[in-house]
Amino acid sequence: MARKKISIIGAGNVGATAAHWAASKELGDIVLLDIMEGIPQGKGLDLMEASPVEGFDCHIIGTNSYADTANSDVVVITAGIARKPGMSRDDLITTNTKIVADCAKKAAEQSPDSIIIIVSNPLDAMTYVAQKASGFPTNRVFGMSGILDAARFKTFIAMEMGCSVKDVSTILLGGHGDDMVPLPSYTFIGGIPIRQLLPEEKIQAMVDRARKGGAEIVAYLKTGSAYYAPSASVIQMVEAILKDQKRILPVAAYLNGEYGYEGIYTSVPVMLGANGVEKVFEIELTAEERQLFAKSVDSVKNLIAVTGM
């Protein structure tokens, strides 16, 4: 059986680290593409040379040509400018709209049956741009957001509790930004509702920290943004697709009437498998949660309007 093929567009920190995670899991052969000559080639070769040490079998190449991405099963788009301190994800929209549209169009031409996953920011709007530019069905274009946001929330909970992160489960909704909606009502520690274990003020402090999780990393790094957790998050999605795992994960998916919204991308729980987003799950929300979700959706709508697509 032929190996699966994963193309990663953008060989910066997120793209290269995603390639590393994918290789270590032996998910398939990997193409790392970037417009900067030499960068993807060098990183691809460096990663390939790690394979005898770590014992993973896959072929990795770096390239500047979309022709090398032909017949990919999954295309991950990380290309675009990154945030600097004081910038929001939304500040990137004008530049990254052009970049993501170009990447999605070229990738779709080479791999018309592929699934496209967006990591570029502002994520929900860029996922919308990629779907329009590629012309793909909406179930085959979606974004990495909720997995990362939930991972941050779970990390802070485990740190507060002093427990294993493996025992923390949660879900969240909304855009990948300051208006995201972590859901303590769907958060459990070893199967126990979080509100039975922690006071409300501590829970809300962690909710706020999760919303600002990306900005916290940017403030520390000063010259870039997070890449270990974002790349691990997108490769969890790639694995679910290539192995047809039917995982229930929060991703930036297209809403077609679910939750009362139409024609936008935002993070909701979905079933992720070989066909991409195979089902969108509508969960019950309190009045306050619905209000917060509506605010988040409005923010996404405003960004989509700016793209002009």
From Swiss-Prot:
The active site is at H176 (proton acceptor). SUPFAM superfamilies: LDH C-terminal domain-like, NAD(P)-binding Rossmann-fold domains. Its EC number is 1.1.1.37. It is an enzyme of class 1 (oxidoreductase). One of its GO terms (molecular function) is L-malate dehydrogenase (NAD+) activity. The keyword NAD applies. One of its GO terms (biological process) is tricarboxylic acid cycle. Keywords: NAD, Oxidoreductase, Tricarboxylic acid cycle. Substrate binds at R83, R89, N121, R152. The keyword Transport does not apply. It catalyses: (S)-malate + NAD(+) = oxaloacetate + NADH + H(+). Pfam families: Ldh_1_C, Ldh_1_N. Catalyzes the reversible oxidation of malate to oxaloacetate. This is Malate dehydrogenase. It comes from Heliobacterium modesticaldum (strain ATCC 51547 / Ice1).
